[in-house]
Amino acid sequence: MHRTHLAGELRSHHVGQTVTLSGWVARRRDHGGVIFIDLRDRSGLAQVVFRDSDVAAQAHHLRSEYCIRVTGVVDARPEGSENPNLDSGAIELNVNELTILNSSEALPFQIDDQSSSGEVGEETRLKYRYLDLRRKTQHDALVLRSNVNQAARSVLLKHDFHEIETPTLTRSTPEGARDFLVPARLRPGSFYALPQSPQLFKQLLMVGGMERYFQIARCYRDEDFRADRQPEFTQLDVEMSFVDQDDVISVAEEILTAIWKEIGYDIPTPIPRMTYADAMKYYGSDKPDLRFDIKIVECTEFFANTTFRVFQNPYVGAIVMEDGASQPRRQLDAWQDWAKQRGAKGLAYILVGDDGQLSGPVAKNITDAEREGIADHVGAKPGDCIFFAAGDAKSSRALLGAARGEVARKLGLIKEGDWAFTWVVDAPLFEPAADATAEGDVALGHSAWTAVHHAFTSPKPECMDSFDKDPGSALSYAYDIVCNGNEIGGGSIRIHRSDVQQRVFNVMGISDEEAQEKFGFLLEAMKFGAPPHGGIAFGWDRIVSLLGGFESIRDVIAFPKSGGGVDPLTDAPAPITPEQRKESGIDAKPKKKETKN
């Protein structure tokens, strides 16, 4: 038997018992011939002591991360030597038998949570990820992830959902983000694609009458490198038949409530909702951080007749930085550099003195009437600073949205342990293709319009008859869940009629012929009594990183990729041999399909 107990579970009531522990040498100390070892296993640490001369001689050879088994008697630590920072700190194991299960070479870095993780480069940590996972913080991250999986499953199974696996080898639909392609050896010149999401298959499951589906799904996107993105990621995927938006949101809130309970936090429900239009108007983002109460104030009408050329723009907006008037000039100059790094020309400002008098470059260039009224208009008090952005509404609001977050950080308005959730609903169904980024399953078509979420999102009922006549005004039957400024999930009521789906494709510039070639199986399925259905997908990596307080999703993935999609541990991706290339049929030309007469 390798063990009778776990190291971190030994307590005072075990005193006098003979136990066997197995684990790793976390720390070794010699004190006058007596050797002390901190033994680590998955449960934590226990102090083991080698006093017997024979086992002490054997223990003399132990080094960090040796894998060992020890048997001995649990003793109470001598008075005054207890360790209150250790769960097992009231006891020690007096060893009478030691077995070295495996030795360890010199470590590339110390496995010690007390030292700053920043002292070890991430590339090194990922190259030796199996050692990095022995650190308590990394171990606990994966345990948390497992617990979160179980909590979500429990909620869904209680509501009669079925956990169903969908294919990971499917057909490429190149209108979205780039697919990872897999050569089909038995059909030379043809390729599978790894799925960017289970979207189409879960809709087909609804057509198939499963009614309630979920899956902790692996998804793949061959995107250009962006910070804190992974080429393979996980989402909790949920789909339901015969539901409306409120039904899906209700189940989603129950899932969120269950998983946040894993860290001891009760989410107040129902979670508030705001429209996409209000999110952009007041927060400059479709994923607003509501942990602090700073709102954008529109000033376009206020400056409608201004002589100040900077404000002679389609949009003028402002935010207020409380007590910001006392900032030194170098800090105000730093704000300009900050704005320019985001593609803006700068960040105009007015300082409101303690006496209410205005100063700064903007104050000198606006009219007396504007000077008299601007502080009241934006809600600024003596001692505050008003920041402005002017230009087109989208980019100006985005700049002010970023600025409100920066102001909150500088003023210490974001408190550790604060959580703020909101649903963002009624997003546009389409956006101009020039403004789009390919993030959905079918994000880009060939026309002036592309889908904001994806091409299978239903228009809102009131837009059903007009969305293809006036795409710019159409609203989607979609809902995104936002936590602390992070979009952690998104879903929609889906299109379940083939005629509506084809109309959406047409708005996106996807012809009937192209739609039939790429999505004919879905369009055909919709003709066989497809039910109304909808669902949601949660970004599982992001959620677990938020729950655990991690800066990066890489910390909550067992074996993540580093920048550029490289795995330092296995050195993937790697070249293949000429034989593999030939056998896979990568370079073969696909056979033309025979046309039927």
Swiss-Prot record:
Reactions catalysed: tRNA(Asx) + L-aspartate + ATP = L-aspartyl-tRNA(Asx) + AMP + diphosphate
Q: Where is the composition biased (Basic and acidic residues)?
A: 579-589
Concerning Gene3D superfamilies, the annotation shows:
Bira Bifunctional Protein, Domain 2, GAD-like domain, Nucleic acid-binding proteins
Molecular function as annotated in GO: aspartate-tRNA ligase activity; aspartate-tRNA(Asn) ligase activity; ATP binding; nucleic acid binding
Residues annotated to bind L-aspartate: 175, 221, 453, 494
Q: Where does ATP bind?
A: 221-223, 230, 487, 539-542
Q: What are the site positions for Important for tRNA non-discrimination?
A: 31, 80
| Region (Disordered) location | 562-597
Q: Which UniProt keywords apply?
A: Aminoacyl-tRNA synthetase, ATP-binding, Cytoplasm, Ligase, Nucleotide-binding, Protein biosynthesis
GO biological process, alphabetically ordered = aspartyl-tRNA aminoacylation
Q: What Pfam families does its record include?
A: GAD (PF02938), tRNA-synt_2 (PF00152), tRNA_anti-codon (PF01336)
Q: Write down any Gene Ontology CC term.
A: cytoplasm
Location (main, coarse): cytoplasm
The Enzyme Commission number assigned here is 6.1.1.23
List the subcellular locations. Answer: Cytoplasm
Note down the stretches annotated as region Aspartate: 199-202
Concerning NCBIfam families, the annotation shows:
aspS_bact (TIGR00459), PRK00476.1 (NF001750)
> Which family does the record claim for this protein?
Belongs to the class-II aminoacyl-tRNA synthetase family. Type 1 subfamily.
Protein's name according to its UniProt entry? Aspartate--tRNA(Asp/Asn) ligase
Please report the organism this UniProt entry assigns to the protein. Corynebacterium kroppenstedtii (strain DSM 44385 / JCM 11950 / CIP 105744 / CCUG 35717)
Q: What's the encoding gene here?
A: aspS
